Curated annotation (Swiss-Prot):
Pathway in which this enzyme or protein is active: Glycan metabolism; osmoregulated periplasmic glucan (OPG) biosynthesis
Signal sequence region: 1-29
Organism name: Pseudomonas syringae pv. tomato (strain ATCC BAA-871 / DC3000)
Annotated function: Probably involved in the control of the structural glucose backbone of osmoregulated periplasmic glucans (OPGs).
Protein name in the entry: Glucans biosynthesis protein D
Amino acid sequence: MNRRNLLKASMALAAYGSVSASGLYAARALAAAADGEIEHFDFAELQAHAKKLAGKGYVSNKQVLPPVLANMTPLQFNAIRYDPNHSLWKDVNGQLDVHFFHVGMGFKTPVRMYSVDPQNKQAREVHFRHDLFNYESSGIDKNLVKGDLGFAGFKLFKAPEIAINDVVSFLGASYFRAVDSNKQYGLSARGLAIDSYAKRQEEFPDFTKFWFETPDKNATRFVVYALLDSPSATGAYRFDIDCQAGQVVMEIDAHINARTDIQQLGISPMTSMFSCGTHERRMCDTIHPQIHDSDRLSMWRGNGEWICRPLNNPAKPQFSAFADKDPKGFGLVQSDHEFSSYQDTVVWYSRRPSLWVEPITAWGEGEVSLLELPTTGETMDNIVVFWTPKTPVKAGDSLNYGYKLFWSPLPPVSTPLAQVHATRSGMGGFLEGWAPGEHYPKTWARRFAVDFNGGGLDRLPEGTGIEPIVTVSHGKVQDFNILVLPDIKGYRITFDWVPDSDSVDPVEMRMFIRTGDRTLSETWMYQYFPPALDKRKYP
């Protein structure tokens, strides 16, 4: 602790006078890194402030960074390390701690951080200062970094890896992410999405302020509050973050206020990357069989139906909407965690978490929205998923959404029915077991193979009739095969899609399997993009 902090700590303790033991403890915790003036804070006041702010014009607080920060490389940015000796709760010496990110590169919006005593609801700001960071490995002359620049974001740590491996990160706009038992970051969540696929440019709201409740020594949950601001909306958020051994669970209370009419409001948005997988090989001319952070969108609809929608890397942007009422959950899933499926020893796609949303308030009518963008590499996120309310959002509207986020290898819930294990696609029009080269089919077709397992498929009596129920938006399906797959204790359904016109419109496919009147599986949904007429031929 430097002299400035020591002096402020002494003044703060004197100001408390005859406070309780818990009050003295909290005062010491606040003084560890927080050096601002004491302010009152509670969530109700934050909600009121956000609502009042929405009634005023938007004022951007992006700052012009000094060239030494604005022109940093990613390597330099990552080399600036927060000094763990100045961590927010260093003096607590407990199970939890917080470090902050330096501003720089594209992270130009100053984010203000506050430490809160939950006992007396007093808060103090943590101001940016040089001694909070180590610049030695970055090549940055800290003497050129002047003024209170704020922070770019923060990361959370939990014992026994405090100051070693962070488990949650908030950085840039309203983006945040977490790890699971595999200790590997993957897809991201956001506080709010605005006009992701609308007639006007997408808007990226910012979390501009955060408040951290000082925990007790033995506490294992973070409580964080946030103020969100953008040209079209404001928001007050409460995050209850439980970093468990196998997953991170966040309970979120979001209060959103519209400044303007919003064409497309995205609640609980998540962003991921899908380049290629078992069914999509267009961008996979590498040694890696698959490249993706997530391979499917999974939905548990309000009526109880489970849907699996494999992701695509389309040639042009595609938007899909799945209407629902009071959804039970949805998320982007990384279903395959086998190293052999990726052969990646650098970014470890086999270790990427899934992200599942569980509404805990009534969300009403709306749709799960899926935006798939073309990407030529693995460094660009191209998948966006969010909930859009059915009722148009008008200026002055206030909305409240409560939900949980589960960052885990697989979602915490699953259907009791059989699930989609994998989807594959390739040349059609021939018998299984035939290899191309000797001759080619006369009629062009596209073959699909969908594997199902679980749900007791391996316990069905011998001779049970399995019937695939398939519908397509155009074209026709034929040449069905039902194959037993002992290795996955399930079944493979293959069929060919044959065009009935020269249309290149996407084909919306839907399938489940049943025996008699009994449904055996979740619903597989897929979007296929037929080639142009002159491409529908074999060599």
